C-alpha cells in the first residue's frame, strides 16, 4: 500500500509536468486542452530507448524451483496490473550456465519491462511496465518487451516508466494493438508511440524530483524480499 501511494505521487507529478504542463508557460487548444510549451518537440519513443524482445526459452531448460546458480525468468506475471514490479510473480528459473550467450537479456537496474500480450476478453495488463531495481537477478522471457533508456535529452528510466503507465499513453498504445485469439503489441507499435520531448534540463529536473520516491519504493521492496526470504528459511527449519 505504501509503495502504491508513492507511485501515485510520482505519476501525479508526471501528469502535471508532461500531460497538463502545469509548471510551464503553455497554451490551450480550442477545446481547452493544454498544448505543450513552444520549445518542446514531438517525437517517438524509439529515440529514447533501445528495444529488445524477450528471449524464447525452451521449456525443457526451465526449472520449477530456484537453485543457487540460476536466474529468475521474467515473465508477464512479474508485471503488476497498473504497473510495477511483482517480485512474487516468478514461476520459472533457468541455470546461469544455460545463459552464457544471452547477456543482453539479463536485466539491470533501470531497465523497463512491458507486457506485450493480454487476454482479448479482459485487457488489463497490456502495455503496462515494471521498472527493474536490481541487477543480475532476472532474465527476460518472450512476450515481454525490454526498454532500455539511452539517455536521450536526459530522459530517465523514471520518466519512461511513468509515461508507459500513464492512462493517456496506454489508451493510444492499445489502440494500435493487434487482435486475434489474444491482443498483442508489436515492437513497432511500441517504439513508434508518440511523446513530447521536453528540453534536457527539464527532464533532468524531473528525474531529480521523483528519484527520492523511487528510492523509497526500492528500499521497501528490498525489505519485503528480505523478510520473505527469512520467513521461508524459518519455515524450512521448522519443517525438518
Task: Name each model-derived stretch.
Residues 1-59, 192, 196, 200-240:
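Non-catalytic DNA-recognition/assembly elements of restriction-modification systems
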Residues 17, 77-80, 133, 189:
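Short, small-residue-rich loop/turn micro-motifs
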Residues 46-65, 77-114, 118-120:
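Sequence-specific dsDNA recognition surfaces
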Residues 75, 146-148:
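Short, well-ordered beta-strand micro-motif
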Residues 80-92, 112-140, 158-162, 171-176:
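Short, ligand-facing micro-motifs at secondary-structure edges
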Residues 137-145, 174-204:
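A short glycine-rich beta-alpha junction/loop motif
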Residues 150-155:
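Non-cytosolic juxtamembrane linkers/loops
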Amino acid at each position: 500500500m505504501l509503495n502504491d501511494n508513492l507511485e501515485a505521487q510520482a505519476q501525479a507529478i508526471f501528469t502535471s509536468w508532461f500531460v497538463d504542463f502545469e509548471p510551464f508557460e503553455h497554451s490551450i487548444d480550442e477545446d481547452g486542452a493544454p498544448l505543450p510549451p513552444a520549445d518542446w518537440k514531438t517525437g517517438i519513443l524509439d529515440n529514447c530507448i533501445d528495444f529488445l524482445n524477450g528471449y524464447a526459452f525452451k521449456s525443457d531448460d526451465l526449472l520449477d524451483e530456484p537453485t543457487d546458480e540460476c536466474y529468475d525468468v521474467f515473465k508477464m506475471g512479474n508485471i503488476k496490473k497498473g504497473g510495477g514490479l511483482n517480485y512474487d510473480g516468478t514461476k520459472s528459473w533457468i541455470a546461469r550456465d544455460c545463459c552464457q550467450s544471452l547477456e543482453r537479456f539479463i536485466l539491470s537496474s533501470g531497465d523497463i519491462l512491458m507486457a506485450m500480450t493480454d487476454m482479448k476478453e479482459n485487457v488489463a495488463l497490456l502495455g503496462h511496465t515494471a521498472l527493474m531495481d536490481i541487477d543480475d537477478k532476472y532474465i527476460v522471457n518472450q512476450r515481454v518487451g525490454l526498454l532500455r533508456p539511452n539517455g536521450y535529452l536526459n530522459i530517465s528510466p523514471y520518466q519512461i516508466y511513468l509515461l508507459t503507465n500513464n492512462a493517456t499513453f496506454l489508451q493510444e498504445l492499445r489502440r494500435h494493438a493487434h487482435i486475434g485469439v489474444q491482443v498483442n503489441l508489436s515492437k513497432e507499435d511500441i517504439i513508434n508511440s508518440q511523446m513530447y520531448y521536453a528540453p534536457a534540463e527539464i527532464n533532468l529536473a524531473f528525474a531529480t524530483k521523483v528519484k527520492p520516491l523511487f528510492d523509497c519504493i526500492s528500499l521497501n521492496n528490498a525489505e519485503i524480499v528480505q523478510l520473505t526470504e527469512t520467513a521461508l528459511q524459518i519455515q524450512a527449519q521448522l519443517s525438518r
